[in-house]
Amino acid sequence: MLKNSHVCIIIWLFGFISGFNIMITGNTLNYWFAKKDIALQTIGILSFITLPYSINFLLAPVFDTVQIKCLNKILGHRLSWICLTSTTLISLTSILSFLDPGTDLVLLSFIAFIISFFSATQDTILSALRTEIVPKELLGFTSGIYIFGYRVGMLLASSGAIYLSIYLTFNKIYQIFACVIFVYLILLILVSRYTNSVDVIEENTSYFYVARCYTMEEMHLKNEFFIKHYFNFFKNCISAYLLKIFSGSHVYRNDISLAYFIVLILIFLVLYRLPDNLINVMINPFLLHLGYNAFEIASVCKFCGVIGAIIGGLIGGIIMKYKNMLYSILLFGIIHALSHILFILLEVNGKNSLILFITIGIESITGGMTMTAYIAFISSLCQGKFRATQYSLLSSMMGISRSIFPIISGYMVVNFGWQNFFLFTTIITIPSLLILLKIQTKL
């Protein structure tokens, strides 16, 4: 059995690398593009690079069943997959470090997309391994450890990288990224001797038994299995998922149809986070446009932004203890939408460190509050023993909002200007709140 201290170290490492990897192809790459004066329209379109994070749940059955025989005997089922994905990430990040967005944009974007795919893949595997090695009584505590590691990883790969760009080129920084992933892999292998994760997933925790449609023998078929059964599995799995979410609820028995209700929920999940996701893609070009340097962006926008989000999460959690969830979602959504008006004030006044600090502080705190309510809402929709699958599918809507719709953000800025862009991010919150009022009586 794992000792509690070993569990904490391993879970912290899991969180660290997840947060670190998402920044490699996320905000840090976005900042590099902006510094290279890549067109705003192009920067917006390249938000699709993070799309694999939206659909990583589709690959979960593969990593539950397929074994890497050459590594499985040495490291075990999960760790062998982690070793493979980490090695691939090291190689791809090293290749990316020799490219230049100014001259190799297409190739660099393609490699970044593949990096994002393997990062999302690793997240899925780490999540599965985390559920296997953490005792039930430590789930709450280790979740905090995981989030702490995640935030540290994000800070180092975003704020830390932008600060380093004062002294180093981004090519050198991405070489450092590859070295960090290598060190992480070595550390994880060293502590892996403490793990006791199983090689074959038990029936009651297997992804495939969510839909109850295949036997263990069928699950271990190789190429023939994936060709014949992969999509059938997901059809059955999603059907079981939808039935389980709403079985026994007011929704399932009321005049509003199940399909219509589900569509409304999915639209809400996309629209509620859309303003933040539009801004996140354009925030680096906006700050550079105003004349802020790398140090100011790293310290105020990135570092203080993360701290503000943490504080906002705590405030949101406290408020939700005394107010019901739907009231909190509505209240936080309105407050956060109004905070976007501060970006217009910043654009009107030009470079002003005090206004920047106030804007980022308020936007981050209210953003942390909305995120807390958002996650709580998703969790409330998940019922029964299929919660993991339900949560993965619902949370993928957040990823779609982050990866697909922000494609238009660059075009909006170029054609309508920064002030109208931020005004739009304020107004676009209204449809999501109207949908919330529509569905609240059915929840």
Swiss-Prot record:
It is found in: Cell inner membrane. Pfam families: MFS_1. It comes from the Bacteria. The keyword Cell inner membrane applies. PROSITE patterns: MFS (PS50850). The keyword DNA-binding does not apply. Signal peptide: none annotated. One of its GO terms (cellular component) is plasma membrane. Its main location: membrane. It is a multi-pass membrane protein. Keywords: Cell inner membrane, Cell membrane, Membrane, Transmembrane, Transmembrane helix, Transport. The chain crosses the membrane at residues 6-26, 43-63, 74-96, 106-128, 144-164, 172-192, 255-275, 300-320, 326-346, 355-375, 394-414, 416-436. One of its GO terms (molecular function) is transmembrane transporter activity. NCBIfam families: 2A0125 (TIGR00901). Belongs to the major facilitator superfamily. This is Putative transporter AmpG 1. The gene is ampG1.
